[in-house]
């Protein structure tokens, strides 16, 4: 994605696979539901961490990520997913949402996409999801993430 104040042209949303992006947007709710199911099945303790309202928020998060991945697929540029992940990471930290749960949602989206996209279009979406996961992993290392800490290191650090 070009920066507008640098005088560079904006990204072309027809440079990638706009038809695939349209199919993703049309099936956004179904994809998000399946992605959340996969994330809940693959991530131990995720179902216990959230009540019904929290699960609805994670479902909405999956829908928003699918929209960003669709933009990446349409433009052929992963910057939309990277920028979104970078923008929302502090918000999740403030809400005590582990970024590992967001990574699980991204992997759930990846597992749900073959129902909508043919195998030739999956790599474009996979690149966008990999870019978002990379950003989430980078932010996960910062202090304040709600992930489970190493008990031994916490004992040594706090002095028990």
Regions found by a protein language model. Name each.
Residues 1-107, 111-160:
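Core of compact, soluble alpha-helical bundle domains
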């Amino acid at each position: 994605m070009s920066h507008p104040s640098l005088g560079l042209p904006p990204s072309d949303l027809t440079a990638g696979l706009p038809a695939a992006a349209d199919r993703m947007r049309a099936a956004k709710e179904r994809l998000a539901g399946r992605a959340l199911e996969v994330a809940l099945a693959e991530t131990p303790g995720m179902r216990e961490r959230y009540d019904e309202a929290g699960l609805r928020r994670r479902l909405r998060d999956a829908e928003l990520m699918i929209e960003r991945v669709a933009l990446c697929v349409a433009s052929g540029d992963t910057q939309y997913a990277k920028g979104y992940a970078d923008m929302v990471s502090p918000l999740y930290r403030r809400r005590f949402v582990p970024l590992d749960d967001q990574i699980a949602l991204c992997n759930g989206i990846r597992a749900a996409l073959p129902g909508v996209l043919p195998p030739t279009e999956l790599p474009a979406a996979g690149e966008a999801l990999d870019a978002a996961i990379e950003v989430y992993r980078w932010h996960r290392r910062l202090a304040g993430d709600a992930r489970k800490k190493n008990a031994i290191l916490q004992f040594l650090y706090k002095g028990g």
